């Protein structure tokens, strides 16, 4: 539903100018997302030619070993390791290579590499000072890195109720469990105080955007249907939620007009944003949860705090997606974990890490579904184990062939 085709995207690019820069131009997931295409514009980049190029690659475990060692341990392989692979022949070379990859995944250096990976992925790390409070921005990356090193379930990122703020000893490459001390509900990184502080903003929209882009690999608008709705603007509304499901001064008494159609159709993005953001609105600028007190500002004069009526009319409830209600953040985490696109995004991010690609959202480096179908199936059927997924990526044909 939300992964629209490039034709629909082109047809609607002028319909949603406020959100158009947030739509991936990678289209129907069959391209790299780089926007450069494969040919000169004269038809030179045919599928047959790509097949020929891909078919001409040869397996080179020695070259793969160098890349794997750098990615997974941050250093080049030792001469002993190089010779283990180089001196083997036939299938023994594959076995030697895979054994070394497993060894790399067991070393303390791998934990350090995962801290770097998750800091980059989460766009956070170190510490910040908010007023008189120092907030640790490393506990969310440490939680994800520990989960990866322990070969835990990726879905614990959204559902785990304890031990969500571990510390990391870089010298030893070890983690120590710790509880988050910001009160409120507990649901993996979704309730992490560092996340809440790092992405504090008007209406808590930056927090929602972080969740959306990090774990769904897609910019807003996130839910686009195929049937445009005339809402009296210069362009139609393309969302799947009813247009009146979000607030405005004339629909539920909201103080901001999220139903504005004078230029952009704001509801294309806010249909989803407004159903999630209230759940994150109770965390203040330090990431502390304030029970019953909305603690994020609005862009209105004198920055008054947001109100529930600003987001939704009284008949609406919070939700992850249309038809996927979530009354609180733990329920939101369960809905996120059950969304197939979340697993696909995880596989795509690991794939891009292995292949040395840039961020899937920031640089539009999408991964075609067909490319990672085998890894996604194994990931889903094997309990979403992160270390197993990384091993699968680093031993795939795409990684070992050059």
Task: Cite the ranges covered by each PLM segment.
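N-terminal alpha-helical segment
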Residues: 61, 78, 97, 368-372
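N-terminal module-boundary/linker segments of secreted carbohydrate-active enzymes
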Residues: 43-78, 83-88, 104
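Extended surface/linker regions that mediate inter-domain or inter-protein docking
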Residues: 95-276, 337, 341, 351, ...
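Alpha-helical oligomerization/assembly modules used to build nucleoprotein complexes
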Residues: 87-97
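Ser/Thr-rich, Pro/Gly/Ala-heavy low-complexity intrinsically disordered linkers and tails
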Residues: 16-54
């Amino acid at each position: 539903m939300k992964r629209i085709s490039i034709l629909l995207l082109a047809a609607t690019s002028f319909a949603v100018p406020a959100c158009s820069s947030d739509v991936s131009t990678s289209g129907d997931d069959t391209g790299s997302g780089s926007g450069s295409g494969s040919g000169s514009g004269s038809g030179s980049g045919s599928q047959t030619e790509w097949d020929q190029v891909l078919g001409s690659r040869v397996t080179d475990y020695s070259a793969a070993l160098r890349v794997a060692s750098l990615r997974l341990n941050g250093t080049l392989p030792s001469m002993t390791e190089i010779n283990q692979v180089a001196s083997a022949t036939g299938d023994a070379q594959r076995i030697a290579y895979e054994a070394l990859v497993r060894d790399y995944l067991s070393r303390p250096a791998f934990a350090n590499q995962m801290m770097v990976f998750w800091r980059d992925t989460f766009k956070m790390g170190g510490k910040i000072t908010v007023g008189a409070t120092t907030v640790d921005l490393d506990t969310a990356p440490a939680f994800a890195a520990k989960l990866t090193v322990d070969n835990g379930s990726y879905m614990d990122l959204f559902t785990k109720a304890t031990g969500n703020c571990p510390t990391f000893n870089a010298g030893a490459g070890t983690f120590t469990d710790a509880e988050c001390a910001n009160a409120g509900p507990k649901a993996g990184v979704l309730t992490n105080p560092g996340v809440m502080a790092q992405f504090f903003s008007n209406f808590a929209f930056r927090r929602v955007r972080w969740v959306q882009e990090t774990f769904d690999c897609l910019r807003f608008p996130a839910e686009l249907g195929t049937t445009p709705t005339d809402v009296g603007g210069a362009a139609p509304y393309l969302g799947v939620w009813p247009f009146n499901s979000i607030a405005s001064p004339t629909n539920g008494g909201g103080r901001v007009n999220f139903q504005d159609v004078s230029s952009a159709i704001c509801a294309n993005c806010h249909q989803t944003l407004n159903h999630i953001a209230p759940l994150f609105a109770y965390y203040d600028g330090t990431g502390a949860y304030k029970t019953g007190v909305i603690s994020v500002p609005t862009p209105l004069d004198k920055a008054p705090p947001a109100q529930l009526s600003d987001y939704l009319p009284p008949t609406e409830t919070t939700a992850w997606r249309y038809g996927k209600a979530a009354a609180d953040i733990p329920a939101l985490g369960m809905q996120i974990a059950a969304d197939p696109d979340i697993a696909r995004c995880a596989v795509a991010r690991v794939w891009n890490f292995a292949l040395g690609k840039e961020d899937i959202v920031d640089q539009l480096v999408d991964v075609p579904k067909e490319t990672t179908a085998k890894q996604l199936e194994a990931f889903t059927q094997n309990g979403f184990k992160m270390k197993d997924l990384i091993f699968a990526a680093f031993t795939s044909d795409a990684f070992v062939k050059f």
